[in-house]
């Protein structure tokens, strides 16, 4: 080992000698590289190579060069830039920079940068200048300006030099904000001046916008200023309420309440107070109040005025307008709430009989006297309901609806019980025949006027439902249907009776509310009267219904017999069509009359009085056994001959205990003459060409044949053909021409020239056709004899 060291010393001496000698005696570059490599290999030398490997330097010298770079850059050097400048690897620079920062407390390594105290003092001076200029500064602004960490700036720069280089103070609520004392004084002066100038509640945001002060400084300085007012909160929507405004609010509320005895919540809301009830309690602690929906009302005012007046009204037959004794500012809703608040209290329970309507209170005796005439109306309406049969139908519907709710699991029991009920009805029917043949309750029927001599209108009630009737009593599984209440007394009738009395008092606008108030009571009185009359005269009404139906059926049968006599004069093929038309019209009407009568006898309710064949067959299946077969057979006879239909009808009448009147030929002639007269009257009243031709043909047929005919418009040609031989050529030509023009009008377009021309020609012939039908005499016709 010693020999090696001696050899090294010798080489070093040679190296030094070579450097001091002339060029011819220096070592070559290769020898130098070998010598350095050997020293590095023996770890006797520590050097740092440059990035290109052509140069090397010792760590100590590199450290001095880094410090020189730090000084050259003004106390702040980026290690990346130093690495580029010294041409040394960045890792070696970072390692040495860390050692420099550890060994020298005046130098800091921050985010890849070396910073010394001189630079920190320099930026502290800059911060002080900026703070003096702006009055307030934050660490975040400094961090973005100097590109340094905020914690380093706060602790190593600002706080370290605060009060020395940096003349200012730190915000106690936000340590990252610093400001000068002069700035604080300016802000205080601005805030104090703004708050002193405000006379009404103002948003803090508006104040800050005007004085250009930050919100956090405003709230931190507010307690130091101690303004004559208060801030509602520290939120963004906070308001400043000056003391003078709060005092004015309090004085206004107390003054208004003292003068009026009440105060509206809306008025307090307009003052900027969000909880009016709490504010009223705070401002009027000694007052006893009624807190209503819209107002607070003084209890003493109500006791002295309203309660006294209500007691007086209750004791007399009078009414009281509350709006005349309560403050005029109160609405109708407020007055109603006051009344209900008073009458619902236990102390004023004796006032519960009073009736309130639209601001006016009525005593019960006053209303009883007012409504007394309506009681007579109710009794009259009850009697009318019995006379018209409305109440009887209502009783039937109500009974069926109550029975129709039986459960489907009781179907067998109901079916087993039906024969007993039917036997009972048969017994009642047997007893009823002695008194005229009526068996069931009365139901509304059509008028007894004859067809084409004033037929009744269609039935009053109709329903689109296929099930137009409902079995009363034991229909198992049927749904329970509610019956609409029967209103015998109408609101309009009650108003008409009480209106004159109320009009004299100037309160006629309450006529309808009072009528609605007593309408149910009056209807109950009317129903009670109807029930009384119904129970008193059931048999009489049933006999009248039975007789009415019997007369109606006989009238229709006479019509059919007379029409049959007339249609037999026409050709055989036309006769068949006319028979079918006759049965579909008058025959169908007879079937309906009898089906409805039987339905009432069997306690069935029928919603639609205008029944078709299927509905009548379905209804027949619901009837008692004694009616079922004859009704079905009568329905089938509508598609047969007139004789078959008459026989089937006689069977139904026999079961219903009705009789058919004998033929009276003298009366037949009167009926034919009456029928012709009515046709002539209709002819004079009509202006429709087709109807005029139809009526004229029927009148001429009756005049010529002495018979009446039931035919629709499509049979006009056949009728004209029949009467042709009884007319002269001119009369035939007139009717044929009029007939052709009618066909032309019906076939042509209404707006066409052809149609208009035909109309004009018809107008010219109309009077002649009417005159022919009116004045034609059978005596002048040889064929008629």
Curated annotation (Swiss-Prot):
It is an enzyme of class 2 (transferase). GO terms for cellular component: endoplasmic reticulum membrane. It holds the Pfam family UFL1. GO terms for molecular function: UFM1 ligase activity. One of its GO terms (biological process) is regulation of proteasomal ubiquitin-dependent protein catabolic process. Residues 404-483 are annotated as: Disordered. Keywords: Transferase, Ubl conjugation pathway. Its EC number is 2.3.2.-. The keyword Cell membrane does not apply. InterPro entries: Ufl1, Ufl1-like_C, Ufl1_dom, Ufl1_N. E3 UFM1-protein ligase that mediates ufmylation of target proteins. Belongs to the UFL1 family. This is E3 UFM1-protein ligase 1 homolog. It comes from Drosophila willistoni (Fruit fly).
């Amino acid at each position: 080992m010693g020999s090696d060291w001696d050899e090294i010393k010798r080489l070093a001496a040679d190296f030094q000698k070579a450097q001091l000698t002339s060029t011819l005696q220096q070592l070559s570059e290769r020898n130098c590289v070998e010598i350095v490599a050997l020293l590095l290999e023996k770890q006797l030398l520590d050097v740092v190579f440059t990035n290109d490997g052509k140069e090397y330097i010792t760590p100590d010298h590199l450290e001095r060069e880094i410090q020189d770079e730090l000084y050259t850059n003004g106390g702040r050097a980026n290690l990346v830039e130093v690495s580029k400048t010294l041409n040394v690897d960045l890792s070696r620079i970072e390692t040495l920079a860390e050692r420099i920062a550890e060994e020298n407390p005046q130098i800091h390594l921050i985010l890849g940068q070396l910073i010394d105290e001189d630079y920190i003092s320099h930026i502290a001076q800059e911060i002080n200048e900026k703070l003096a200029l702006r009055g307030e500064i934050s660490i975040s602004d400094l961090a973005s300006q100097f590109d340094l960490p905020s914690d380093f700036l706060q602790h190593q720069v600002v706080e370290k030099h605060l009060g020395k280089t940096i003349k200012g103070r730190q915000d106690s609520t936000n340590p990252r904000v610093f400001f000068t004392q002069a700035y604080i004084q300016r802000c205080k002066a601005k805030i104090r001046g703004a708050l002193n100038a405000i006379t009404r509640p103002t948003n803090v945001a508006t104040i800050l916008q005007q004085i250009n002060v930050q919100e956090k400084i405003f709230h931190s300085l507010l307690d130091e200023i101690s303004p004559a007012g208060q801030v509602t909160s520290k939120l963004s929507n906070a308001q400043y309420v000056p003391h003078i405004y709060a005092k004015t609010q309090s004085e206004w509320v107390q003054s208004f309440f003292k003068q009026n005895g009440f105060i509206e919540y809306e008025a307090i809301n307009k003052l900027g107070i969000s909880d009016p009830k709490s504010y009223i309690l705070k401002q009027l602690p000694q007052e006893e109040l009624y807190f209503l929906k819209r107002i607070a009302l003084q209890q003493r005012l109500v006791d002295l005025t309203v309660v006294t007046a209500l007691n007086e009204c209750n004791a007399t037959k009078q009414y009281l307008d509350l709006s005349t004794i309560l403050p005029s500012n109160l609405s109708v809703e407020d007055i109603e709430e006051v009344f209900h608040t008073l009458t619902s209290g236990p102390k004023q329970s004796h006032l519960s009989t009073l009736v309130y309507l639209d601001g006016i209170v009525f005593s019960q005796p006053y209303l009883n006297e007012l409504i007394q005439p309506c009681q007579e109306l109710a009794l009259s309406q009850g009697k009318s309901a019995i006379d018209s049969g409305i109440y009887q139908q209502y009783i039937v519907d109500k009974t069926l609806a109550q029975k129709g709710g039986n459960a489907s699991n009781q179907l067998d029991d109901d079916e087993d019980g039906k024969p007993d009920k039917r036997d009972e009805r048969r017994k009642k029917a047997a007893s009823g025949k002695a008194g005229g043949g009526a068996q069931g309750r009365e139901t509304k029927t059509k008028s007894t006027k004859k067809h084409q001599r004033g037929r009744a209108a269609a039935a009053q009630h109709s329903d689109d439902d296929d099930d137009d009737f409902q079995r009363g009593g034991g229909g198992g599984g049927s749904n329970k249907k509610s019956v609409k209440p029967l209103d015998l007394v109408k609101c309009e009738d009650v108003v008409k009776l009480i209106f004159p009395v109320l009009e004299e008092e100037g309160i006629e606008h309450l006529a309808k509310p009072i009528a609605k108030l007593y309408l149910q009571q009056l209807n109950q009185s009317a129903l009670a009267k109807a029930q009384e009359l119904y129970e008193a005269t059931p048999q009489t009404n049933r006999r009248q219904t039975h007789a009415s139906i019997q007369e109606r059926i006989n009238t229709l049968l006479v019509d059919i017999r007379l029409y049959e006599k007339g249609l037999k004069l026409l050709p055989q093929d036309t006769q068949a069509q006319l028979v079918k038309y006759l049965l579909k019209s008058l025959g169908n009407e007879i079937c309906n009359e009898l089906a409805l009568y039987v339905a009432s006898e069997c306690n069935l309710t029928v919603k639609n009085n205008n029944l078709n064949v299927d509905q009548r067959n379905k209804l027949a299946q619901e009837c008692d056994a004694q009616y079922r077969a004859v009704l079905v057979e009568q329905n089938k006879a509508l598609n047969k001959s007139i004789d078959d239909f008459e026989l089937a009808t006689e069977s139904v009448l026999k079961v219903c205990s009705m009789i058919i009147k004998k033929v009276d030929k003298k009366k037949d002639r009167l009926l034919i003459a009456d029928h012709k007269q009515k046709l002539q009257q209709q002819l004079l009243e009509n202006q429709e060409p087709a109807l005029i031709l139809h009526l004229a043909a029927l009148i001429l047929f009756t005049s010529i044949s002495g018979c009446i005919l039931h035919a629709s418009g499509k049979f006009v040609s056949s009728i004209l053909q029949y009467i042709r031989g009884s007319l002269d050529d001119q009369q035939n030509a007139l009717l044929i021409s009029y007939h052709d023009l009618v066909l032309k009008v019906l076939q042509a377009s209404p707006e066409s020239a052809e149609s208009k021309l035909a109309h004009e020609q018809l107008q010219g012939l109309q009077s002649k056709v009417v005159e022919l039908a009116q004045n034609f005499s059978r005596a002048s016709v040889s064929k008629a004899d």
